[in-house]
Structure formats: C-alpha cells, structure tokens
Amino acid sequence: MIRESIVGPDGGEVVRLGPATVRILEDGSTTGHRLGIGEITVAPHSSGPPQHRHARHDEGFYVVSGTARFTVGAASYDAPAGTLAMIPPGAPHTFANPGDEPLVLLNTFTPDLYVQYFRDLRELAGSGPGAGGPTAEAVGEIMSRYATEVTDVYAGD
C-alpha cells in the first residue's frame, strides 16, 4: 500500500550541484513514479545547466522567489515569482539567476525520471577529478541514461 508523503520545510533529500541546491520533495515512491518534485535554489548571478532537452519527460518550473531567466531555444524570458514555465519533451531549455537574491524554483518531472539523475550527478561529483568536478563526458553519459542531451535545437528540427 502506498502511503501519503508530507515533507516539512527542513525535510527532503538534499543534492548540492555547484551554485544550485536541489531538495528532493517527492522521488516518485508515493506517486507510482508518475511525478517527481524538487525545490531548486540557485545562488545569485549564477547560470544553470547548459541548454538541453528531454525525450521522455515533461518538466515544470514554478518561480517561488527571485527572478529566473528561462531560455527555450533562441528565446529568453525573465520570470518573476509566481511564474510557471512548462517544458514539454523535445524543447531545449535552461535557466539562470541573473538577480541579486537566491532564486527558488519548484521543479516537477512527469514521470519522475530526473530525480535519479540528480542523485547520479551527486555521486559523480563526489568522484570527479579533483576540485574541477566531473568531466563533460561523464555528465553527458549520465544525461544519456535519462534520454537527455545538450542542445539548443528542438527535437524534429
């Protein structure tokens, strides 16, 4: 029997990735793996991941606080608190924090594939080559496990 999940403000699993911290709030175990949810906090004046696209999951970003800069393909959008960005499979995207305050995003994945991606990156960062962190090739291999690739081109274009 699947039980409910209530995660308090200090709960969840924390994954630190450079200037960002991901707090996993729902890893899919309560939702039959239909939905994963994380809270991403990005340091001021920080970029996010390289622009990339997913083949097998939708991704949502709700701006809780701060202002996000979303780039989708060639278009960029400054998104203040209260903005929702939904990214379908095949759409290249990234985000950044251009502001002076931390950016907090509520991040959803349907299905929950990307929760394990964050865990895999954490493990890789712990075994990366010195202070330089993991290589681009190693990160690319992890991305490919989750049908994700670095690109700024829409799938099918």
PLM-predicted stretches and their roles:
Residues 1-10, 154-157:
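Basic/polar N-terminal segments that are highly enriched at the extreme N-terminus
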Residues 7-8, 74-92:
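Short acidic-glycine-tyrosine-enriched beta hairpin
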Residues 12-51, 57-58, 108:
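A short glycine-rich, His/Asp/Glu-containing loop-to-beta-strand
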Residues 40, 61, 85:
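Conserved GNAT-family N-acetyltransferase fold
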Residues 49-51, 72-77:
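Short beta-strand segments
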Residues 56-68, 73, 82:
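Glycine- and acidic-residue-biased ligand/ion/polar-headgroup-sensing regions
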Residues 69, 89-115:
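Ligand-binding loop in jelly-roll beta-barrel domains
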Residues 119-157:
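Acidic/histidine-enriched, glycine/proline-rich intrinsically disordered or flexible terminal extensions
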